[in-house]
């Protein structure tokens, strides 16, 4: 089969991206740094039937989207985010599910000198199994060690690389010697496009529990402010009523004014001992049956003791 010329290939690519944008209401803009062809093939296979991955040159993707803005103006929101080594993952499924599938396809990778660290790298305290001749190597990196049974032992956890730092040759060599693959590479979600709206992927981590707690926190803040400024709202009125009742109750206690709910409080303040005495009286009837049941048991035990004594006497004098 003859290979299609470049003009035909471009035309087909434009048609494909436009068709995907029309057919799929949701997509991810993903970064593909350090993702090889073999890993990309594995990602496509794992997403088959659930999502479609489309990569390409940024200029071609922008041109295709700009040419389709008349039919779908919301696509213009994608343009500022098409920069760097990026692509699209189109889907009709739950976005969180597809996000989790992308994360599952990340693969561990060794540190390479000159690479930018995507995460912090910490070397744990351990016996390295390396011989004493490597001691100077650890000293050059500022790692405290000791010789234990003829091998180098790292005494405490060491933060070797910070996020965003360039990996040095010494750090890369050390991690390789310790067989540590600190990084993992895969498609990284940069933005989420959902039915014309675009937002940060962190929004996918918001659960119903998160929304509920944030809502309650907002209600508490509104109630607090409204109570301070004396402005009644649905959130503050219950607290205002309770506070008002407390003030009326305090006024009733200090004056001759009274009402039914205040009578019990006044009676308690007038004679607290009456309430204290009422508690043992209420507990006494419950304790009485236990005492009566214990008494017959004691009598039965005494009778059994007398019978055993009599038996002992007959046995001795027979």
UniProtKB/Swiss-Prot annotation:
Disordered: region residues: 293-318
Crosslink site: Glycyl lysine isopeptide (Lys-Gly) (interchain with G-Cter in SUMO2): 298
Cellular component terms per the entry's GO annotation: cytoplasm; cytosolic large ribosomal subunit; nucleus; ribonucleoprotein complex
Subcellular location(s) of the protein: Nucleus; Cytoplasm
Keywords: Cytoplasm, Isopeptide bond, Nucleus, Phosphoprotein, Ribonucleoprotein, Ribosomal protein, Ubl conjugation
Major location (coarse): nucleus
UniProt cross-link Glycyl lysine isopeptide (Lys-Gly) (interchain with G-Cter in SUMO1), position: 298
SUPFAM superfamilies xrefs: Ribosomal protein L10-like (SSF160369)
GO molecular function: large ribosomal subunit rRNA binding; structural constituent of ribosome
Name of the protein in its database record: Large ribosomal subunit protein uL10
Modified residues (Phosphothreonine): 59
Native species: Bos taurus
GO biological process terms, semicolon-separated: cytoplasmic translation; ribosome biogenesis
Known partners and oligomeric status: P0 forms a pentameric complex by interaction with dimers of P1 and P2. Identified in a IGF2BP1-dependent mRNP granule complex containing untranslated mRNAs. Interacts with APEX1. Interacts with FMR1.
Record cross-link Glycyl lysine isopeptide (Lys-Gly) (interchain with G-Cter in ubiquitin), residues: 264
Alphabetical list of InterPro entries matching this protein: Ribosomal_protein_uL10, Ribosomal_uL10, Ribosomal_uL10-like_insert, Ribosomal_uL10-like_insert_sf, Ribosomal_uL10-like_sf, uL10_eukaryotes
Function: Ribosomal protein P0 is the functional equivalent of E.coli protein L10.
This protein's encoding gene: RPLP0
């Amino acid at each position: 089969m003859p290979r299609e010329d470049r003009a035909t290939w471009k035309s087909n690519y434009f048609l494909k991206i436009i068709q995907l944008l029309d057919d799929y209401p949701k997509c991810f803009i993903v970064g593909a740094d350090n993702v090889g062809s073999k890993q990309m093939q594995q990602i496509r296979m794992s997403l088959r039937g659930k999502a479609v991955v489309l990569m390409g040159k940024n200029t071609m993707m922008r041109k295709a989207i700009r040419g389709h803005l008349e039919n779908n103006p919301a696509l213009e929101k994608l343009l500022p985010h098409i920069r760097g080594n990026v692509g699209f993952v189109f889907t009709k499924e739950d976005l969180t599910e597809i996000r989790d599938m992308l994360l599952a396809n990340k693969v561990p990778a060794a540190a390479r000198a000159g690479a930018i660290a995507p995460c912090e790298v910490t070397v744990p305290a351990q016996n390295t199994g390396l011989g004493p001749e490597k001691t100077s190597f650890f000293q050059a990196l500022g790692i405290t060690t000791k010789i234990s049974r003829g091998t180098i032992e790292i005494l405490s956890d060491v933060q070797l690389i910070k996020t965003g730092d360039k990996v040095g040759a010494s750090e890369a060599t050390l991690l390789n010697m310790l067989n540590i693959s600190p990084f993992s590479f895969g498609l990284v979600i940069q933005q989420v496009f959902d039915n014309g709206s675009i937002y940060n992927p962190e929004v996918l981590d918001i659960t119903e529990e998160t929304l509920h707690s944030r809502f309650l926190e907002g209600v508490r803040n509104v109630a607090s402010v409204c109570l301070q400024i004396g402005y009644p709202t649905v959130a503050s009125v219950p607290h205002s009523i309770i506070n008002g009742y407390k003030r009326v109750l305090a006024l009733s206690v200090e004056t001759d004014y009274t009402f039914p709910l205040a009578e019990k409080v006044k009676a308690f303040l007038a004679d607290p001992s009456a309430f204290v005495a009422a508690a043992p009286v209420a507990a006494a009837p419950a304790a009485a049956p236990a005492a009566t049941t214990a008494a017959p048991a004691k009598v039965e035990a005494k009778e059994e003791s007398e019978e055993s004594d009599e038996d002992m006497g007959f046995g001795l004098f027979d």
